[in-house]
């Protein structure tokens, strides 16, 4: 692949053996050797490919018009003949804008030049000494159930200045939204406040981190007080918890959230530390289980403008699906669980150095690809991440080590000479797959993947049926989500998470939730259009759909061995 932008890390010795100095100078790298610390924009060099991959930074065309503006003003010295107040001097130059009382309380301006920071052409947010009109920064944040990602954006140019990410600190209260809602319910005195504080603390820490490592020529290091707008995309539960609004109603029938409309408030109101008067814009949701992250993704992928049949799937803990039937949007949410993100797995871990990310079962043994290592090895890893658990389950089914119903075969059912025999292990009556000397894949691990598979595939079929469409009518399947981008088509098809008919129709769109937050930061029009999109998206409650339980049970079955490729 060719690196178009971003830091792909140090060139390895293996790459130097296979690539010429001219190719390396052009930014050409071996994709299997690259372990970036930040998002990359890449160009694939294969002439033939079965799945198109759009870069993590894919952004559709949009009208840049930020709601935060800067204007240079001059405060003149007053005297006995000219006693014009500072407030009036500001209004004369800025026009009919609101000047908050909190700003007047601390207004001590000497004669000189200042930079006024104005929100939505109607309210003065801050006054900066000198000419700061070349500098304006914001942050776009994606709050997922499992991870939180923050990007620092130069709002003058639209350039991403840096990123920070971490595991959602709310994991101590539960790995999924329902467990966290249960925590709030069980702790009525302070549960809601605890859930809010851990996420706002994380955001403040990430803003500190990304500012600390970002310097601008002529200005120096960016500080948190330079950030004047923060936009957030998140699922509906995470948005409630961020804003300190009770999410209890989301956890019980009829699953009615406290709010779904966008929210625009001062960041300081919920404890987020940024510039004076900094705004916090939270994107709109559709329902309790189709949140702002999905609205953002649908907007980024321009689903309302499609002139064909497109299925959009955000693969994460919640597993949301949107079907665009020539612009008509139908949606549903399926409880995929955190298995595909490496959680709820006996040896699971996040995608980090030391994690197994790919697995091959061969007659010579189990071959592992481990993040941070250069090629397939049999060295001892730390655990298995989401793409790794999906790969191993695919291989277990391909080699017949698990049946179509997901159960491990019995060691007594195969010959001791069979290359697979030493890979199976009995722990009492429990059967396990021996992946390494230390790590095992249990029946429970397989079941976690199976439940995710059943949830996503059944939602896929249910939406098609609701729209009156067949598999043949489907033109494109877009895979979104920070984790979805790392799940190869071979594993998605091989485990039956997606039907084999769509293998050549897949497009990976990366973290479209964060991209949507970015668009909202850079364009007031994008905010308005997302709000319109959310209003027009239809939601289907799978649990209330006739025949869904039977459909879900059918979708739990794995594909036939003959249908799975290596």
What is each model feature region?
Residues 226-236, 315-317, 409-419, 473-483, ...:
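A glycine-rich phosphate-binding loop feature that marks nucleotide/adenosyl-phosphate handling sites
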Residues 144-145, 150-178, 249-262, 296, ...:
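Glycine-rich phosphate-binding loop of actin/hexokinase-like ATP-binding domains
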Residues 16-140, 145, 157, 191, ...:
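Nucleotide/phosphate-binding catalytic cleft detector across ATP-hydrolyzing
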Residues 234-249, 469-472, 481-501, 542-551:
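Short glycine/threonine-rich loop-to-helix capping motif typified by GTGT followed
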Residues 397-467:
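A contiguous, well-structured pocket-lining segment that forms one wall/lid of small-molecule binding clefts
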Residues 169-213, 344, 355-360, 448-451, ...:
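N-terminal phosphate-binding loop and adjacent alpha-helix
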Residues 285-300, 450-454, 505-541:
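Glycine-rich phosphate-binding/hydrolytic loop that grips phosphoryl groups
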Residues 56-62, 161-162, 350, 367-386, ...:
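Catalytic P-loop NTP-binding/switch module of NTPases
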């Amino acid at each position: 692949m060719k690196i178009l932008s971003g830091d792909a890390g140090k060139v390895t010795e293996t790459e130097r053996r296979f690539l010429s100095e001219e190719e390396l100078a052009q930014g050409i790298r071996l994709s299997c050797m690259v372990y970036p610390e930040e998002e990359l924009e890449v160009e694939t060099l294969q002439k033939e490919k079965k799945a198109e991959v759009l870069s993590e930074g894919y952004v559709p065309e949009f009208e840049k018009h930020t709601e935060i503006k800067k204007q240079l003003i001059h405060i003149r010295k007053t005297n006995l003949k000219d006693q014009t107040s500072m407030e009036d001097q500001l209004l004369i130059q800025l026009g009919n804008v609101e000047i908050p009382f909190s700003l007047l309380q601390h207004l001590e301006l000497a004669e000189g030049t200042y930079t006024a920071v104005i929100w939505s052409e109607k309210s003065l947010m801050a006054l900066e000494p000198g000419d700061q009109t070349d500098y304006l920064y914001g942050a776009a944040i994606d709050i997922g159930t499992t991870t939180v990602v923050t990007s620092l954006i130069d709002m003058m140019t639209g350039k991403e200045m840096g990123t920070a990410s971490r595991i959602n600190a709310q994991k101590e209260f539960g790995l999924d939204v329902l467990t966290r809602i249960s925590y709030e319910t069980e702790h009525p005195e302070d549960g809601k406040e605890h859930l809010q504080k851990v996420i706002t603390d994380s955001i403040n820490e990430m803003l500190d981190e990304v500012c600390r490592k970002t310097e601008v020529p002529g200005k120096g290091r960016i500080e948190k007080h330079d950030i004047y707008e923060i936009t957030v995309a998140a699922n509906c539960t995470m948005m409630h918890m961020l804003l300190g609004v009770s999410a209890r109603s989301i956890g019980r029938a009829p699953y009615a959230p406290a709010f779904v409309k966008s929210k625009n408030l001062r960041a300081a109101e919920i404890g987020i530390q940024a510039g004076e008067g900094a705004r916090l814009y939270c994107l709109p949701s559709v329902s309790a289980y189709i949140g702002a992250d999905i609205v953002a993704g649908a907007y980024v992928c321009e689903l309302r403008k499609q002139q064909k049949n497109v299925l959009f799937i955000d693969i994460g803990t919640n597993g949301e699906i949107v079907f665009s039937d020539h612009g008509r949007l139908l949606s549903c949410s399926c409880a995929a669980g955190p298995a595909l993100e490496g959680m709820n797995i006996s040896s699971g871990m996040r995608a980090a150095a030391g994690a197994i990310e790919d697995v091959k079962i061969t007659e010579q043994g189990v071959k592992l690809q481990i993040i941070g290592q250069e090629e397939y090895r049999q060295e001892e890893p730390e655990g298995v991440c989401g793409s790794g658990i999906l790969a191993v389950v695919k291989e277990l089914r391909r080699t017949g080590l698990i049946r179509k119903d997901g159960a491990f075969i019995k060691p007594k059912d195969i010959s001791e000479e069979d290359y697979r025999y030493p890979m199976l292990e009995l722990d009492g009556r429990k059967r396990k797959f021996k992946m390494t000397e230390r790590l095992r894949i249990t029946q429970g691990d397989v079941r976690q993947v199976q439940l995710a598979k059943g949830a996503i595939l059944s939602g896929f079929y249910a939406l098609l049926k609701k729209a009156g469409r067949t598999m043949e009518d489907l033109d494109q399947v877009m895979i979104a989500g920070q984790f979805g981008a790392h799940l190869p088509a071979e594993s998605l098809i091989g485990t039956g998470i997606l039907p084999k008919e769509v293998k050549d129709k897949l497009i990976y769109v990366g973290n479209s939730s964060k991209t949507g937050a970015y668009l909202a930061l850079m364009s007031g029009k994008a905010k308005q259009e997302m709000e319109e999109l959310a209003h027009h998206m239809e939601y289907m409650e799978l649990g209330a759909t006739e025949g869904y339980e039977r459909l879900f049970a059918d979708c739990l079955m794995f594909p036939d061995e003959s249908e799975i490729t290596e």
